[in-house]
Amino acid sequence: MLLLLLLLLLLPPLVLRVAASRCLHDETQKSVSLLRPPFSQLPSKSRSSSLTLPSSRDPQPLRIQSCYLGDHISDGAWDPEGEGMRGGSRALAAVREATQRIQAVLAVQGPLLLSRDPAQYCHAVWGDPDSPNYHRCSLLNPGYKGESCLGAKIPDTHLRGYALWPEQGPPQLVQPDGPGVQNTDFLLYVRVAHTSKCHQETVSLCCPGWSTAAQSQLTAALTSWAQRRGFVMLPRLCLKLLGSSNLPTLASQSIRITGPSVIAYAACCQLDSEDRPLAGTIVYCAQHLTSPSLSHSDIVMATLHELLHALGFSGQLFKKWRDCPSGFSVRENCSTRQLVTRQDEWGQLLLTTPAVSLSLAKHLGVSGASLGVPLEEEEGLLSSHWEARLLQGSLMTATFDGAQRTRLDPITLAAFKDSGWYQVNHSAAEELLWGQGSGPEFGLVTTCGTGSSDFFCTGSGLGCHYLHLDKGSCSSDPMLEGCRMYKPLANGSECWKKENGFPAGVDNPHGEIYHPQSRCFFANLTSQLLPGDKPRHPSLTPHLKEAELMGRCYLHQCTGRGAYKVQVEGSPWVPCLPGKVIQIPGYYGLLFCPRGRLCQTNEDINAVTSPPVSLSTPDPLFQLSLELAGPPGHSLGKEQQEGLAEAVLEALASKGGTGRCYFHGPSITTSLVFTVHMWKSPGCQGPSVATLHKALTLTLQKKPLEVYHGGANFTTQPSKLLVTSDHNPSMTHLRLSMGLCLMLLILVGVMGTTAYQKRATLPVRPSASYHSPELHSTRVPVRGIREV
């Protein structure tokens, strides 16, 4: 037990939070009995009308009616007061927005009245085949309490009636037909509850050399630890023994823990006579609706995912899809599709319908049609999700990673066209960037680690998620089956969130900017060289390796489709050529411009900031030089010089009582002359650079700077204490103008005096030559810094 406690104490610093939610649709749908309109249990005069067939080639938008009943008939009764009421309103708002999006995409026609389940209300039926009421209800179930759909009680007003039949003759009506729900094609029941599925997640550990009992004990302890903190463990966690010690160490740099695990789940409950879904229920996990970590957009996208399951994107419903060769408006020609899914020679389950296969081929840039779209490997032969390796970012993959990174993609909409129940407005599709134009080999386990596609990565470094909205870590998960990609982190690494920026006064040597129009770029920019670093230039780095760069957040601005420019803190806008590396004025290092990732959609291009975003007005620029004196005969190598420069910089920042955001590009010569450029970075809190410059001058004149480095003491020389260069452009221009005016006045005066002397005296000797005073400009070039 001590071992477990030690492990749990070591665990928190290594946690890498990943904001992801998984879908439980397959196991949920299996628990629900699908009802179709049965042979009527009522006389013909009392029967409800069946679904009206479309009479037009222009079907109307799908009419979805949501019904929030607030019942408590299932496990996990939920208190609707206080936080619960707020969670319920969030759920209903998400349902309204999600159904509005669907209504603009899918279209059918017809009224709606739901069926009752004879197995629920009827205890026995007539079994004599010769009886006129054969298989009709002969004995009612005394415990019948009505119909429900995934725990939501269906009102009698939404249901057909039922009757008790004698062996011969007319029935005794028990419950007449309800009025039904007018102008509705699909009924969605909404529940908010605490259920067992909301907490359903398991941990499996791989601990080589450990007994099964020890692994089970550790699993239970880790699960308990995670759940007490509101997290749920992902299914796989590997530990290994370190030498002969009994204390396990982590096999990788992090343990992935997610929270929340399940936002919502849904199922279809009833079908019409052509197997089209008529009703379903979505259950929201109450504890997550009040979580600040989930935005309204997140809940809407999670709702949309579950709603599409209930409308037919389900392994349980694929076999019921219809083939309508004459088009949607002639339903009498429709039949059940003979082949919707199949397994290939490697056992991969594929959805093989025509529109889906063509849509995938178009997405990958393959001519003709693909052999089908891979479905996620799940328990059994049924799967209700796209394979994550191939369609990462699609709304219908098995894990949800936030609204910002999820798309209602063309391939998913093509699936609904193939269902035969709906017509699809393809203009509502959102572009899926993952794998676009990558060819038929993309997304295979055998190719994802070969470096053939930059959508995947190798190793475990930090970089950028493929949408470039977030920084990410190169990692895998069970859905990727060994393939690795830059997965977003949840520790304030979203570049588009301004609140993730650096606090006031904190040094920002890489010049990062967090802003709604910021994106993640692979870069190694720095405003100051650390000991051992060397400035890199494109000419010296013809093949820039991914390992040399990290994900950094910088401002971007679209200038056209696929064209953009970038801005680093304190720099001007710089054109970013896709597929190239660029340098940024004022910074050492390089920035890589991704190709085919940014400014690809009309939405991106329309988001151009006009006028360009201005973060702050640049402060004046100064150059500060100090001549140091060291021990007699003491010499420094190159690395020692760089170390001393860094030590002097730290001492200066300490002396000025400010952060390093005022000091840039420190250097030192072999003759021990230290030089640093002074300018105030945007976001840097404190006095103006001119005030700091003056204060440092006065302070160092009173008390020389002392630095201890490499076993030796260095001090500034009193006689050569400070040499400054003012780089304020306006002041420089003013001084130049005044100097020129003074020179002209002197020249005019000299010429006038000479002329007067010539006229007043005889030219007995040449006039004395006049040497005008030389004007020394105070402008000193600042390498790597643009003068403004």
From Swiss-Prot:
Active-site positions on this chain: 306
Molecular function terms, GO-annotated: metal ion binding; metalloendopeptidase activity; peptidase activity
Membrane topology (UniProt): Single-pass type I membrane protein
Sequence similarity: Belongs to the peptidase M8 family.
A cellular component annotation (GO) from this entry: membrane
InterPro entries linked to this entry: Peptidase_M8
EC number: 3.4.24.-
Chain's gene name: CIROP
Entry note: cofactor: Binds 1 zinc ion per subunit.
UniProt disease annotation: Heterotaxy, visceral, 12, autosomal: A form of visceral heterotaxy, a complex disorder due to disruption of the normal left-right asymmetry of the thoracoabdominal organs. Visceral heterotaxy or situs ambiguus results in randomization of the placement of visceral organs, including the heart, lungs, liver, spleen, and stomach. The organs are oriented randomly with respect to the left-right axis and with respect to one another. It can be associated with a variety of congenital defects including cardiac malformations. Early death may occur. HTX12 inheritance is autosomal recessive.
Lineage: Eukaryota, Metazoa, Chordata, Craniata, Vertebrata
Function: Putative metalloproteinase that plays a role in left-right patterning process.
Biased composition (Low complexity): 40-56
Parts forming coiled coils: none
Cofactor(s) this protein cannot do without: Zn(2+)
Domain of life, source organism: Eukaryota
The keyword Magnesium is assigned to this record: no
Gene source species: Homo sapiens
Glycosylated residues, chain numbering: 333, 425, 491, 524, 713
Residue numbers spanned by region Disordered: 40-59, 767-788
TM region(s), chain numbering: 736-756
Main localisation: membrane
Keyword field: Disease variant, Glycoprotein, Heterotaxy, Hydrolase, Membrane, Metal-binding, Metalloprotease, Protease, Signal, Transmembrane, Transmembrane helix, Zinc
Subcellular location: Membrane
Name of the molecule in the record: Ciliated left-right organizer metallopeptidase
